[in-house]
Amino acid sequence: MDDQLDSELDSARSWLVVALGVLLLLLVWGVVFTFTVYSQALSAAFGLSELRASTVFSVTTAAFYVAGGLAGILAARVPLRPVVAGAGAGVAAAVGILQFTSSYAGVLLAFGVLGTAGGTTFVVVISLVPQWFDEYEGRAMGITFTGNGLGILALPPVWVWLLERTGIRGAFAVIGGATALSILAAATVYRRPSGHRSGATPTVGADWIRDTLLDARLLAAVAGFSLLWTWYYALLADLVGILTRGGIPRPVAATAFGIVGGVSVAARVASGEFADRIGIRVTLTAGVVVAAASLAILPWIRATLPMYAVLVLFGAGLGAVAPLFSPIVIGRFGPANATAIVGVFTVGQAATAFSAPVVLSLLRSASGGYTVPLLLLGVATLLGGVLFYRGTAPVAAA
């Protein structure tokens, strides 16, 4: 069993899993997290107010992180292929619902299903790839996570082109349909390597849940992982507002997050190379420090040149953090329930996705500006990095 497993790791099939992962993350991110590109067309087609449109995105995000994470936990009990196929069918169902519904409730249902299917796909991809690698694990994860950045870069122009010619339903039929077909195609290939690294059949039941809830280091790692994303969701919520407050023209500020995503594509590959050489936990922690420091600098940005420099640093931080967490937690807490473990961390991340924008808004209102909020959120990011680093320390070093 071990010889068979060793022969599969770092093999041609391993890299096929990576290639499909890049494609799936590109499409999933390009559908779910480019909402701002098509939100106006969606609102016009279904008569949604600004509040209702923002609620649609909130529901999608909640489903992506919470329902997708929980689906990942449950997926540890069954073979992966039907789970992946179910996610593909879910995306197809979401596209179908959007074609026929005319109500706000129908739109919420469609995007809730889309978020759940997309989140499930995400958890499967990032938990499966590390199981197929040994020597090149960091490089493989870095390449896989380029899909996220490529989706944010490549899909917006496609959305714009399609919306100008077909409207929201037609655009969703094309992009959503391509996403569904790609996930279904991956279902024919995706499986866990024979025997897993642990040689055990994954079991997620009451005992596993109890042991997980009583594992202080896992809980510290989950808390840290949630906090270390504080900077990212603060930027998602109000980067344009932060930059324009400092005097950056709005048209320039509107392109800022795309720059972060673009830089992160190269940084994801580079971080994998660094991880294979200096250590995966050290590389991720360095990315957290860079992101937190950049957040603290952001309130003092008053010109475009330093703005671009800080955006490059954010992209470097994102490129180090995003691809490396799953191999860290799988390696530390065991690959036998890899999908479930990653699902737990994904659910934890949802808390920050919701709370960081709210905390930023409340602190900004209380302080009258962005300086204090961003400094405090930078500290929270650093605290998350420390907790995650300590919580994922090898058992011998614990």
What spans do the regions from the language model cover?
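C-terminal ends and interior cores of transmembrane alpha-helices
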Residues: 89-102, 290-302
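Extracytoplasmic gate region of multi-pass secondary transporters
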Residues: 35-40, 215-269
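Helix-loop-helix hairpin linking two adjacent transmembrane segments in secondary transporters
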Residues: 144-192
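Intracellular juxtamembrane helix-capping segments at the cytosolic ends
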Residues: 42, 120-133, 320-333
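Helix-to-loop junctions at the C-terminal end of transmembrane segments
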Residues: 67-79, 267-279
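Interfacial helix-cap and linker-helix signal at transmembrane-aqueous boundaries
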Residues: 42-43, 74-75, 154-166, 243-244, ...
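C-terminal transmembrane helical hairpin of 12-TM major facilitator-type secondary transporters
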Residues: 260-264, 277-328
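Cytoplasmic helix-loop-helix junction between adjacent transmembrane helices
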Residues: 111-146
